[in-house]
């Protein structure tokens, strides 16, 4: 009996040493959330191509370049209602995770992106608040990075900088980066301040090439 007990203890110790705990695995996770502007202004063209199409291609390339074990989430905002007063309430109250927090799967990610059509207003603050809640519910330990893509300012009365500060102050350690697409000077300055509050950086892109290059550089940071 003593021999069997000793063998059992040794076996348990062997399993414990060979298999890292779930908590240890979770601590090593890298979680990336992309907040995607689907508001009506994204239908506008730059260099002959719609901003929404440029953004879709760039984000897809970014996702493909991430390390295979990176958890990726895609949340959209501005895609509900319409860009008139009749659709403002719905548009401003809706953000949606269209690709849940897990490693990149090409066809699933592509399908999620392909269905996105630029439609309504720009509830940036709500998108950030909903991301914080989702990260907290997921208990997202490890490295958490948020990328906010937008071509315009908050139009739903929210305060993006305040929501970024809440995200930073929560029990989820998160960095917020902002990629502004075709912003005016005033918008650039406001977004710079918001990115500083998020512990990240603000990247201004005024053309398709600049936007695509920005995402390539960001993807490289996860492999360095």
From Swiss-Prot:
* Keyword line: Signal
Is Signal among this UniProt entry's keywords? yes
Record-linked PROSITE patterns = VWFA (PS50234)
The record's Gene3D superfamilies line, in alphabetical order, gives: von Willebrand factor, type A domain (3.40.50.410)
Task: Give the domain of life.
Answer: Bacteria
Range of residues in the leader sequence = 1-23
Domain named VWFA: residues: 31-224
The record ties this protein, via InterPro entries, to: VWF_A, vWFA_dom_sf
Q: Describe the family membership recorded for this protein in Swiss-Prot or TrEMBL.
A: To B.subtilis YwmC.
Q: What is this protein called?
A: Uncharacterized protein YwmD
**Can you name the source organism?**
Bacillus subtilis (strain 168)
Which gene name does the record give?
A: ywmD
